[in-house]
Amino acid sequence: VTIGTEGMESRDPALVKGETVTLQGKQAEIFVRYRDIRVDHSALYRMDQQQQYIKGFFEAVQKHSVKDSGLVVRLFDRVQEYMVTNMAKDQYLKVAMDAVGSGKLSDEDFYTVPGEGVVTPRYDEFYADKEALTPILLELFYREIE
């Protein structure tokens, strides 16, 4: 990933804005969790970091799974104890394998809830635009009955 946020170097000296870094272990956790609470709406910037990480991780899995067909299964085996799902293992592995073969993730694969950020004396607040959100929810979660 390319570090796009000021101040991460306070958590890890390698995470300097503008530098491109291959994240490993604790560094990856720092990258996806970091936010500077002194900066307004830093939670929104953190979501950008998380999307950047997901895209990079997905690309790496795609690249390495070409040479290692068992990679996706091993990744799920490692995270299984942290998962909660009502899907059978063969079902979620099929979804994952289909995703890995589907091409690159882009910004269009992510949704941000439309709305307005407001800074208050105590917290950053976000108010969803319910009218603008409705078409997104319908597109993602509903299918018209024929």
Stretches found by the model and what they are:
Residues 30, 52-59, 70-77, 81, ...:
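Solvent-exposed, polar/charged alpha-helical surfaces in well-ordered, non-transmembrane soluble domains
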